[in-house]
Every structure is written in structure tokens, then in C-alpha cells.
């Protein structure tokens, strides 16, 4: 009970502080109060580090190599502890766990090609990841191999976007550490499986990066892709809306009754945010 109360207080306090900062950064002046000033202080974190194509390619290759290394380690572990492993096909079958079977079925026969007693059980799984699997499978001709390589590549691409994102506000060392911590985090094992976690990570990282760069049409496109990966992808509309409010000082314009400018910014910039909600 006490833990729940303390957690609620911490969460709502954080929401309150974030709301104050959003309002302040959007151009709406609050009363001159020491407490409010302390809560809404905004330190500039702009980094002098500029990413290069060589760095991004290196991040992609290292991330992909890491996923391959984890895969090879898993093969060794399977041969050591599983007596039923007799070939590469048996190894691939070990990755057909949890939701992997459903994404495999969607990529293989579509949503209508599999049902249980007339119920299309795969309908709850979003389509973008199996679509990409099916495209990659045109080359490799094995959906299990195609799915794994798709996950590896998407994870590596996500690392590239996250590296670029962190480099906007932090130093190169911080960006590198962020990628390393992400890679060794226990949940990261799902980024190398036949599931769409890597797809959601990739599209979310791309969306957040373009939010910070204020490229709103790309925000809409990548945000829509995130929503096609998982339902939670639509939540990216929240940071997009916050950045739009802050960057263009919308509250300040509304306070000054500059409705024309607000409307112009909405239909030329902000309307792209709604693309991910459709």
C-alpha cells in the first residue's frame, strides 16, 4: 500500500513538472516564483559532436555483428545442452517460440490463411514486421532465416538512429554508452528473435530522431510505421505534439492572439503528427 502511494506521488509529481516545463518552453510565462523557476529550468545540452556517415555505418556493422555473435553463442549453447539438435533446421525451430509462430504464419499465408475453429487468431498481430519478412524472403527463401536477418538489420538500424538522436544533445561517449547499455540489457534478447520488438524499436527511434530535427513529414511517416508495428506506436504522437508546442512557442502565439500563425503551423507542420493516428 505504502509503495503504491509513493509510486503514485512520484509519477504525478513527474507529470506535474513535465507539464510545467512544456508550458514554459511553449512560450507561456508563469508567475515569477523561485520554486517554479527551479522546476522549469532548462539547461542547454547541445553537443558539439556531429555524426558522420562513417560513424553511422560503423554503428550499424558493429550492432549487426553483435547480434550475429549472440546468435552463434546460442547455437553453441543449443549443441551443448540440447540433445535434439541435429542440424541448422533444428536450431531455427528453437526460435519459433512465443509470438514468432504468429508472425511466421502472417508472412507465410496472411491473416485469412490460418484460423482455429473459424477464429482468425493472428488478427491481433500488426502487419509491418511480417510484410518486411516476406520481402526479405524473396532473397533467402526461408522465412525463419529471413525473419532473423530482418530483426538483426532492424535492430542495427535502430542503433544508428539512437546514436544520432543522443548525439544531438550529448557527447559521443554518451551516445556510445547508450547503445552499449541497450545491447546488453536482458530484454535485448527479443531484438534477435522472430518477433517485432526490433521493428518497433527501429520505427520509434527514427520517429524520435526526426521529432528532434523538426522534420514533420518524416515524423508522420515513421510514426505511422511505428503504429503499424505495435499499438503503442501511436503514443509517439505525444512527444511529437510536445516538441511541436515547444519549438514553435504555440502557447505564446495563442496568448498574443496570433491565431493565423498557429493555424499555419498546424496545417503545414502539426498535421503530419495525426498521420500516425490514422
Give the location of each predicted region.
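Short hydrophobic/aromatic helix or loop-helix immediately within or flanking a transmembrane segment
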Residues: 94-113, 118-141
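Transmembrane-helix signature of polytopic, membrane-embedded enzymes
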Residues: 142-146, 162-184
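Membrane-interface alpha helices of multi-pass inner-membrane proteins
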Residues: 183, 187, 205-209, 217-243
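Transmembrane-helix motifs of polytopic, lipid-linked glycan transferases
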Residues: 133-135, 149-169
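Short acidic/glycine- and proline-prone juxtamembrane loop motifs at membrane-interface regions
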Residues: 192-199
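Membrane-interface transmembrane helices that cradle and orient dolichyl/undecaprenyl
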Residues: 170-172, 207-218, 248
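Start-transfer (signal-anchor) and selected internal transmembrane alpha helices
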Residues: 1-84, 272
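Membrane-lumen/periplasm interface segments of specific transmembrane helices
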Residues: 66-81, 95-96, 225-227, 233-278
